[in-house]
């Protein structure tokens, strides 16, 4: 009996990028189809970023066929689109561990493979990194060509333009691939561009634009208009030069990002002839080749496990509303009551829940694109004008606007409402998206009020509190995922600033929790009570200002005080310690422990796995409290790896 033929005969021959060098265009095209099928099969079982990776399959194959990774440095912006790159660089056998604990990352990661030249996760960093590699080569380091692959969304960020400007000034040989997946090129335009690129291969780069303009003059009206539209995004300078040419780049394109022959030939010729910085404008279709993705509004950008035939995602039935939706709904309700409320997001209206308000009040919700620096100061300006701006950002992206928070918001004491989504550990996106540092950054800023929601009902109260707070900037952090299933108020209440609440009363150990780990504190208290340790659990609610009356009471009435938070060192626990040191209460003989995230970056896994590794489970809290209150009692403290 003969063996069943492989469904991936071309991919089976690939152990690394070198295996692509001898393949024909037909073989490379077939390889791309097999890679695309493999990505769909893998992500259907693991979840992940599907649409972006499907859109760059041909481009990735062509890049590895032309360039020589890892000597040549392929630098993927954001990294959502790196799955075909990982498959072709020796990690195919591990793809089913994608984003799982102990498995491969969903982003490029230097420690994972020499083919991952530069780590990613946040946007608009690739051109800067590629230029750094190029300068390293010029100064004698063993670096080949450097290639930044950046999307049409990421290139709108200020950092990308700063890098383009510097690269054009230095004239270093490097390549920027603009992956434009928001433009459709009709077949005649594709044919035109094939002809224009033929001219480019026969003449200096500078002749390309003039040739394009000359040809366009003689095309039929609809085709001529299509050709001009294809260049419209980048052609806006006096004299018809592209923005990139004005910045010092040679510009090639648009190129059909799904035509293997055109891609390979363009890359080969450009690589052979370039002496300075070159931008190649490649047009792709996000979700290409998988009908459910191409038909979805978001092109199945980020997905959970799904059915391959239908594309339907296999999501578990939630036990409680998720925090993001609660925020979006309650903010929309407040906006209906107060016309001064506006909202700002940096390219994440759905991810932050602002799409709910956007549907009802479209003129009062502003998506500024990938521009957190601008978003912060834009919100500050609106606050200065008398509006009530709610700026919703993921915790890990708050970092990108920190100087503006210091200089434009806190220093001027402007009432910007900073809504910090994805606070704490977020799971499969791993270290690049962990919300670990926002409290450490904000709690030390004069004028700022910093809150954290312990559950979804508290989130309701805190949204209302933020809306009513006009005396300065206020931040509210809350985690990813569903809430605890608590009873929800019809409308939130305005909380007293700087006042916490006591959840359970005890006499021996006090656990002072800040944020959504309150549930773990309450579980730990039950364990401690079962062992005869009388335990108080309090919800601080505020990190700045601290509830000093509550802290005094906990110190006076207990042998041990444990602070608990879902953030890095230097946050809530540090603020409590500073207060105790300042008031001389560290000399009272109490055992004091701070429980924070460890001093390291935590790799991807489920949130439960990550918090276990971090030593922040209910068992860890119980062990820490027991060791502090009764040091003579033998306690085994286990941090799960």
Curated annotation (Swiss-Prot):
Signal peptide: none annotated. Its cofactor is Mg(2+); thiamine diphosphate. Catalyzes the acyloin condensation reaction between C atoms 2 and 3 of pyruvate and glyceraldehyde 3-phosphate to yield 1-deoxy-D-xylulose-5-phosphate (DXP). The keyword Magnesium applies. Pathway: Metabolic intermediate biosynthesis; 1-deoxy-D-xylulose 5-phosphate biosynthesis; 1-deoxy-D-xylulose 5-phosphate from D-glyceraldehyde 3-phosphate and pyruvate: step 1/1. Belongs to the transketolase family. DXPS subfamily. Mg(2+) binds at residues 152, 181. NCBIfam families: dxs, PRK05444.2-2. HAMAP family: DXP_synth. GO terms for molecular function: 1-deoxy-D-xylulose-5-phosphate synthase activity; magnesium ion binding; thiamine pyrophosphate binding. GO terms for biological process: 1-deoxy-D-xylulose 5-phosphate biosynthetic process; glyceraldehyde-3-phosphate metabolic process; terpenoid biosynthetic process; thiamine biosynthetic process. It is an enzyme of class 2 (transferase). Homodimer. The gene is dxs. Binds 1 Mg(2+) ion per subunit. The lineage of its organism: Bacteria, Pseudomonadati, Pseudomonadota, Alphaproteobacteria, Rhodobacterales. It catalyses: D-glyceraldehyde 3-phosphate + pyruvate + H(+) = 1-deoxy-D-xylulose 5-phosphate + CO2. Thiamine diphosphate binds at residues 80, 121-123, 153-154, 181, 290, 372. Keywords: Isoprene biosynthesis, Magnesium, Metal-binding, Thiamine biosynthesis, Thiamine pyrophosphate, Transferase. Pfam families: DXP_synthase_N (PF13292), Transket_pyr (PF02779), Transketolase_C (PF02780). Its EC number is 2.2.1.7. InterPro entries: Dxylulose-5-P_synthase, THDP-binding, TPP-bd_CS, Transketo_C/PFOR_II, Transketolase-like_Pyr-bd, Transketolase_BS, Transketolase_C, Transketolase_CS. This is 1-deoxy-D-xylulose-5-phosphate synthase.
